[in-house]
């Protein structure tokens, strides 16, 4: 088991690579055509849930391989989970973060599924609602994700052995809790996961309860200055995962970076968010250096755990 700390020349990020020990650091029906401004390959689908909720999702099937590569009939896929602000910008189209992610993954040959947990329940966002007052909790979103994974694995053209899941903020928290719940309450027919990647999740409850997660390759990308979902609980929780044989956890902590460091908007104080470490609000916004580094790390991670898809 190895532990390594890496700093870029400008100290843009620190990498906590935990290969097993921490040393000194603790099939729905299409319901609409692609909206204007969305990627051309986009389909919108509906996934009926056992609860009676119909989960809407955005679906980008992987590009078809050329005729010369027709034997490569299945491609890897990624399930992507939105944050507390929901999937959409004010104009009603996918926000730039999710649109960019979908386009990048799709161009690389991956299928992409993005469930809309909020819109499916008549919600736009929950960022301004205290955790204790939210009508939709993380466990609800975990159930959404589990149903979405089953649907995704059943789609023609998807390699059910190579499915990854990722999430940002509340979606990252959901991703981590998904790994915990799949270990505690396994379900017959669920696909295995090839890997999971999260941006700035909330890890406090996981650390408090010393939760144990499904052992899959895990990439955690955190902001050192995050006062909304602080990095340290995630670093500490990642260290507890070392106790499991064969653990594969990598944590990147980006210096001078707040919540949303992978975005392009400038950092601002959000006094409307009551869930941070300060009563005065939280900071949110991008860090150009951390953005480049984190997106490159994400791309490398997917190549490692999902493989390189057959080019269309």
What does each model-found stretch correspond to?
Residues 89, 136-214:
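Primarily recognizes the serine-hydrolase "nucleophile elbow" in alpha/beta-hydrolase
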Residues 3-17:
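Bacterial N-terminal signal peptides that target proteins for export
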Residues 33-73:
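N-terminal cap/lid segment of alpha/beta-hydrolase-fold proteins
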Residues 246-312:
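C-terminal catalytic histidine-bearing segment of alpha/beta-hydrolase fold enzymes
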Residues 227-235:
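Conserved alpha/beta-hydrolase "acid-adjacent" motif
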Residues 14-26:
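Bacterial N-terminal signal peptides
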Residues 55, 65-153, 265-266, 271-284:
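Serine-hydrolase catalytic machinery in alpha/beta-hydrolase-like enzymes
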Residues 220-222:
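Short beta-strand/loop motif that positions the catalytic acidic residue
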